[in-house]
Amino acid sequence: MGGESNEGGEMGFKHGDDESGGISRVGITSMPLYAKADPFFSSADWDPVVNAAAAGFSSSHYHPSMAMDNPGMSCFSHYQPGSVSGFAADMPASLLPFGDCGGGQIGHFLGSDKKGERLIRAGESSHEDHHQVSDDAVLGASPVGKRRLPEAESQWNKKAVEEFQEDPQRGNDQSQKKHKNDQSKETVNKESSQSEEAPKENYIHMRARRGQATNSHSLAERVRREKISERMRLLQELVPGCNKITGKAVMLDEIINYVQSLQQQVEFLSMKLATVNPEINIDIDRILAKDLLQSRDRNTPTLGLNPFAGFQGNIPNLSATTNPQYNPLPQTTLESELQNLYQMGFVSNPSTMSSFSPNGRLKPEL
């Protein structure tokens, strides 16, 4: 038996038959025995043969299958029982060839059958303890805890499912309530706005300034003045040219002049109608006076007077008695003539009106 070492310092066993004596022997070879057998070795510098014997590790620290996967250890199966008994007794149990050998051969290697059985049982028990400890360490809980955990999870899942089924109904109820509340608020706001707008039509809002009285008489006077000012604004819009006037006195004078000019135009038109049909005698003064009285009784503005309304009321047969060969003048023509007369100032001269005869013709000059 001889020992050999490679460059990395790895050691192995080698056997051979001596040609001279026919004795089988076991030697150390450079084949790495732990490269494939034991994946738990952290580095390649550690020698399992030397360190295992020096540290005094027992067979219970190593799995029996470590040597079973190593093809280099299967060569011990054909050894004779008496040839290597001394070497096998001193060799650690982790390097024994359990893979290809039976129970009787292992006993022959170790010197007795009882010793081999004890080693095998010790290895199996240590392997089972190791796996049990590792499982407990990974789980970190007792079997009772493992059983209670699924029950708690199942209860929590049931509660979650029930809440999820109830949530859509609650959400729908809440959305309907919000919609109803919004509608009720909108209706209340509309009613309040309508109730606020209705009283504004019935009264005039007056703000009391500093130095002004707030009793009922003074407030009534202020309301009356406010109404007068509104009517003045209406007249100002009807009369042309009054928008540029600021003073009330000047504006009233302009309105009076405009009304007088309208009266003169009405007189002129009535005379013109008399010339068309001489048989009709029209008392213009009486008609105008009656129309003015009616307008005052109805509290209608004077500017809204229709000059032809009195003619139709007092002379209902005017259209029947007129000569059919003369067509009635259209309203647009009458308006254009009135404007021309107003611009020319023809009506403003009273001597011109006196030159007309009662029947509408000019008087001969003497």
Swiss-Prot record:
Domain (bHLH) spans: 212-262
Protein function: Transcriptional activator involved in cell elongation. Regulates the expression of a subset of genes involved in cell expansion by binding to the G-box motif. Binds to chromatin DNA of the FT gene and promotes its expression, and thus triggers flowering in response to blue light.
Origin: domain of life: Eukaryota
The answer, when asked if Transcription is one of the entry's keywords, is yes
What gene, per UniProt, encodes this protein? BHLH74
What tissue expression does the UniProt record report for this protein? Expressed constitutively in roots, leaves, stems, and flowers.
Q: What is the lineage of its organism?
A: Eukaryota, Viridiplantae, Streptophyta, Embryophyta, Tracheophyta
The protein's UniProt keywords, in alphabetical order, are: DNA-binding, Growth regulation, Nucleus, Transcription, Transcription regulation
Give the protein name, as stated in the record.
Transcription factor bHLH74
GO:BP terms for this protein?
regulation of DNA-templated transcription; response to blue light
Q: Quick one: where's region Disordered? A: 1-20, 123-201
